[in-house]
Amino acid sequence: IGEMTTVDPRQPVLILGGFLITAEAYAPMAAWLKQLGVFDAHVVPVTRLEWLLTTWGFGWRRVLDRVDALVQQLQASSPTGRVTLIGHSSGGVMLRLYLSDEPVLGRGYHGATRCDRLITLGSPHQAVRATPLRLLVDRRFPGCYEPGVDYVAIAGELDLNGDNASSFSRRTASGSYKSIAGDAELSGDGLVPVESALLKGARHLVQPDTAHGGFFGKLWYGSLQRLESWWTFVTND
């Protein structure tokens, strides 16, 4: 577990979204954080084609190169000299690799020298079945690998029989949970099981009635009604 570090909640934030989700889905989150007093908040622009390319290492590198450029831009104007990272779904797993200085994909990013907090939202950290690159991250950089970084893992619990759940999540959630964690009966956000999203050693929050994304339910991690809850948890450390 990394040493606890004091993080300024107002320092700039960079958001990396989830697989096949484009930046506009996170624009309300960035705007809300700025209204709350965060110095600046940006979303990493990634097209759907670029997400499809993350099946391969060069696709990860392309996205993380963009993360690195934006982090350095935000760092230059940060009152603390540091940046907070938010990763949704697969983005949260990718950012764990970004924090490391090990040249796994032919380049070490040294992200932990610039970023002292990583918040993950419904990220499939621990899985019995995952893509090779996600497995590599959890094998090479298990848990809270970088000392001095405050890792916070947010999981959602979605009642599949409740009003929030979409018909899609009702049909597919149990199959997703079985695929990721080996058990169709687990609780989760409609895609990622709670036990997979709670990164080992991180600060944990299980958020009720929260879907993985807009496709899975009306209220998800990026909905303003949910944002305030997990952001309050993160910053009241």
Residue ranges and their predicted role:
Residues I1-D237:
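Lipid deacylating catalytic domains
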